[in-house]
Amino acid sequence: MARPPPPDTPARRRKQAAHARGLAAEDRAAAVLEAQSFRILARRLRTSAGELDLVARRDDLLVFCEVKLRRSLAEAAESLQLRQRRRIIAAAELFLADHPELAPLAMRFDAILLGRDGGAEHLEGAFELEG
């Protein structure tokens, strides 16, 4: 027997709106990478360590990209904390374990910062493995 849908509450509507903003932000970030000749290999990839927003490849370079949308680019930059960087690195390691053919590629951890005002900044090498 199917469960009835959850009640429509203000909290649920906020969560749905945040989810939609996140998807739109990831679309914008993917477009930034594609404009730089990257091919998107994965979006919102869930692993046991956490989620990878975007995984992209250009030639012999594999990029794990975190997307941050905030009111301003400065707020977006501040939101990428050490704990999250470690989670992204762990998720990337799991991704590579599942895709050993990509392991020989050069690897980089980027961030694409997006402001709600439309601003965007691509931080290449935003953090390192030691992160």
UniProtKB/Swiss-Prot annotation:
Any Pfam family from its record, for instance, is UPF0102
Segments spanning the bilayer are none
- Which GO molecular function, any one, fits this protein according to its record? nucleic acid binding
Q: Which family does it belong to?
A: Belongs to the UPF0102 family.
Q: What is this protein called?
A: UPF0102 protein AZC_4471
- Native organism is Azorhizobium caulinodans (strain ATCC 43989 / DSM 5975 / JCM 20966 / LMG 6465 / NBRC 14845 / NCIMB 13405 / ORS 571)
Q: What is the lineage of its organism?
A: Bacteria, Pseudomonadati, Pseudomonadota, Alphaproteobacteria, Hyphomicrobiales
